[in-house]
Design a protein with these regions (language model features):
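Conserved ABC ATPase "signature" region
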Residues: 32-50
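Conserved ABC ATPase signature
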Residues: 55-59, 63
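Catalytic Walker B motif of ABC-type/P-loop ATPase nucleotide-binding domains
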Residues: 80-83
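ABC ATPase nucleotide-binding domains
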Residues: 159-184
Length: 184
């Protein structure tokens, strides 16, 4: 199992190559030549082979997220957990990350668990998805099953409706009383 944290969590004192090599050195007894080959293959898979010598501070946000993804796949895990992988990414980087996660899932047979508020991106790659509200699963199914779900709270979440079962306004007392200083 591996995890891609929202922040990427790269080691700031190691270059990209060393960040990806770290789990291989910690959890295997592979010879250095094989570690080098493996790291270069993982960096090639995420499009960063040419950035191997760069430090995390020299990377864009999207490049840092891809470097962290290369580290997450270094040990060829069967399961990868993604914590908000698309947050704060520009549309191009988001598209690249969606493509990479989809390729990992389908081409390599890796199970990917993606926790995200980016509904269109997740539903475009998910075989099965859950919608959680107030610590409870309120809907589950394929992307099509969720899109066809008539539940008002599911519709509000999927369609980005501002007011509905989840209210826009935080509960408050009488507005006029608050304006006139008669409220709490």
């Amino acid at each position: 199992m591996s995890m891609l944290f929202q922040s990427g969590a790269l080691f700031t004192d190691m270059n990209v190559f060393e960040n990806v090599a770290f789990p291989l050195r910690e959890h295997t007894n592979l010879p250095e030549a094989l570690i080098r080959t493996t790291v270069m293959m993982k960096l090639e898979a995420v499009g960063l082979r040419g950035a191997a010598s760069l430090m995390p501070s020299e990377l864009s946000g999207g490049m840092a997220r891809r470097a962290a993804l290369a580290r997450a796949i270094a040990l060829d895990p069967e399961l990868i957990m993604f914590d908000e992988p698309f947050v704060g990414q520009d549309p191009i980087t988001m598209g690249v990350l969606v493509k990479l996660i989809d390729e990992l899932n389908h081409a390599l047979g890796v199970t990917c668990v993606v926790v995200s508020h980016d509904v269109p991106e997740v539903l475009s790659i998910a075989d099965y998805a859950y919608i959680v509200a107030e610590q409870k699963v309120i809907a589950q199914g394929s992307a099509q099953e969720l899109q066809d779900n008539p539940d008002r709270q599911v519709r509000q979440f999927l369609d980005g409706i501002a007011d509905g079962p989840v209210p826009f306004r935080f509960p408050a007392g009488d507005y006029q009383d608050d304006l006139l200083g008669r409220g709490n």
